[in-house]
Design a protein with these regions (language model features):
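Structural signature of extracellular appendage/secretion-system components
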Residues: 1-619
Length: 619
């Protein structure tokens, strides 16, 4: 052990203090850098020189420079960001939906419904006035148009969510690819345990935080360890092995990246399904794996799964649209069922898709219920000259009696409806039921038209007793369409308002059908939503249910988002207290390391004087 060893002791202190100052300066200059993690120098004593009298110190050394990073708190931070972005995105979209459905006192669909039935009331009071017909049709057009617009608004919002989903998934793939590249760089730069690529790990953490805002993630970093060299350092991620996954679906495995893929071929609106492709090219639908972040919010809103015909079968916005469809369908069916009780010269149904002669009515449309209809024949004086009840049940078909009764067969039976022992003045003598099927278009058509022997001046009407038969098939209708996207006033009535009638009989001045239409607003009707469930409500009541559900969903999401915001703020503060730069602390450290540097320099100057003294003795 010589005097030069004492010189090296001072030099080691000088070098260590210099690195401490450089590291502290790095912290200070990056105090405002987003995602920067403050660093600390791990300084240890050099191995001592062993003598019989005891160990003699040989100075100090910098073992490594580490990030002040707590992996456990960082995991909580990514989780809190996932939860916050999930509810924040949902809140943003749901608030937009609520703005489109204001239903204020003097505007909105509820007010349109009220005015629509008020116009029916005015028409019932003046059934012979042409102007009242025009006003009623105009009122109906406003209501139906607003229903169409509301449905299309939801379509546009859902389309926008899907477009954003595509961008978000592409961003996830891009971030995951960057993380894999960083892992490759870490393998090259961290060639031994003393070299820490802190900046690369900061970049990877920043990418993880970005990714956590898009989706829920789980990162596994092997060789995570604890270091208690100083108070504010706890759990480190110093290992090279790295796996990033979404609920078990691996995105990054070391240097390898696995892409999330999208497919739009099975959707009628070009919506993307998310899948994961295995090595054998097997596709796995991973929509259910996304439970946090914006992507989960998007999927919850738009829907995750599709039916075989390309429609979304879940999703908040999908439910709203299905509820609007249920509202419109019941409105159409019930309105047309009432309107069909008004006498007309003939009845022709809509084109019935896939309804063959042997198709049961309830298989064609589950809105048709058990019950019966009463077919009535009127003369020009408004008197009923014949009537017949036809039962409808689960086995009733359009024109096949193999398993039960059929509409055509029951209508055309030669019966004595009037019980006058005359078989020539009954329903089948005045009108004939015909069902035609087009094999090419796969559509059918039901009609009730005058028989050849029927003299002019007779009219047919169908009064419904709970079956919804006439309204569902579109026999003598006031409204066209099947759902909220295409509900509208019958084109023929639209073109010629004179065709509108208000009575059940053809007698001028009869307002009995119009009165029945007015009463429809007070009756609880069945509404069957594909995803929203079944309810019995009045027309206004069901629409109010739709808007109340929208408001309730929005309020619930806002409450969840407020909670997640508070949690994220707390966790972020904890994270900043550990990994963020505290300027006062760094300035204090700078003064301390500056003092250490001066003290080490003093050791060197002292040894230098010792050497000078030694050299003078030699002279």
């Amino acid at each position: 052990m010589g005097i030069f060893d004492a010189l090296y002791t001072g030099v080691s202190g000088l070098n260590a203090a210099q690195i401490q100052i450089q590291t502290t300066g790095q912290n200070i200059t990056n105090a405002d850098s987003e995602y920067y993690t403050r660093q600390r120098v791990v300084q240890v004593a050099n191995e001592a020189f062993h003598t019989k009298g005891g160990d003699i110190g040989r100075g100090t050394m910098v073992q490594q420079i580490v990030r002040v990073h707590d992996e456990f708190v960082f995991g909580r931070l990514t989780s809190s960001y996932s939860n916050l972005e999930y509810t924040s995105y949902k809140e943003q979209v749901l608030q937009e939906v609520n703005q489109k459905f204001p239903d204020l006192a003097d505007s909105g669909i509820l007010e349109n419904i009220k005015k629509y039935f008020a116009m029916w009331n005015n028409y019932a009071s003046h059934p012979n006035e042409a102007a009242q017909k025009t006003v009623l049709i105009d009122s109906a057009n406003v209501l139906m148009g607003n229903i169409n617009d509301s449905y299309e608004t939801l379509n546009k919002i859902r389309d926008s969510v899907n477009d954003q989903l595509i961008l978000a998934v592409n961003e996830v793939n891009d971030i995951a690819r960057q993380i894999a590249d960083i892992n490759k760089q870490l393998q090259r730069t961290e060639i031994n345990t003393r070299i820490n690529s802190n900046d690369l790990r900061d970049k990877r953490d920043a990418l993880e935080l970005r990714l956590s805002k898009l989706t829920n993630i789980n990162s596994f970093k092997q060789d995570v360890s604890s270091n208690s060299s100083f108070d504010d350092a706890t759990i480190y991620d110093m290992g090279k092995n790295y796996t990033l996954s979404i609920n078990g679906i691996t995105l990054v495995e070391g240097e390898n990246f696995h892409e999330i893929k999208m497919d739009t071929t099975h959707s009628e609106r070009g919506y993307s399904t998310l899948f994961y492709e295995l090595n054998d090219e097997t596709r796995i639908d991973i929509s259910s794996k996304f439970t946090g972040g914006k992507i989960a919010g998007m999927l919850d809103l738009r829907g995750r799964y599709m039916t075989s015909d390309g429609k979304m079968r879940d999703g908040i916005l999908t439910t709203y649209q299905d509820n609007l469809d249920a509202f419109a369908k019941t409105f159409i069916t019930q309105t047309n069922s009432v309107y069909a009780s008004g006498a007309v010269k003939e009845m022709v149904s809509d084109y019935l898709k896939d309804a063959k002669a042997n198709t049961t009515l309830q298989n064609y449309d589950n809105g048709i219920k058990d019950g019966d209809i009463t077919v009535k024949i009127y003369n020009t004086q408004g008197n009923v000259v014949a009537q017949r009840k036809i039962s409808i049940n689960a086995s009733t078909t359009l024109n096949d009696i193999t398993r039960g009764n059929s509409i055509v067969q029951d209508f055309n039976k030669n019966l004595d409806d009037n019980n006058d022992k005359n078989f020539n003045n009954d329903i089948d003598d005045y009108f004939k039921a015909v069902y035609t099927w087009d094999e090419h278009t796969q559509t059918g058509n039901l009609s009730f038209k005058p028989t050849e022997k029927n003299p002019t001046g007779f009219y047919i009407a169908i009064e419904d007793n709970g079956t919804n038969f006439a309204g569902t098939l579109g026999l003598s209708k006031f409204l066209d369409g099947q759902n909220a996207s295409n509900i509208r006033v019958n084109e023929a009535i639209q073109a010629d308002p004179a065709l509108l009638h208000g009575g059940k009989s053809p007698q001028p001045g009869d307002n009995s059908m119009a009165n029945a239409m007015i009463n429809l607003q007070n009756v609880k009707l069945p509404f069957n939503s594909r995803t929203g469930g079944d309810r019995d409500e009045t027309i206004s009541g069901y629409y109010r249910y739709i808007t109340t559900q929208m408001a309730s969903d929005t309020q619930s999401t806002m409450t969840q988002n407020a909670t997640n915001t508070a949690i994220n703020t707390t966790v972020n503060a904890q994270w900043q207290s550990i990994s963020g730069v505290n300027m006062n602390e760094e300035l204090s450290n700078l003064m301390r390391y500056q003092s250490s540097y001066g003290a080490a320099a003093k050791v060197i100057t002292t040894v230098e004087k010792m050497l000078s003294t030694l050299l003078e003795l030699k002279q």
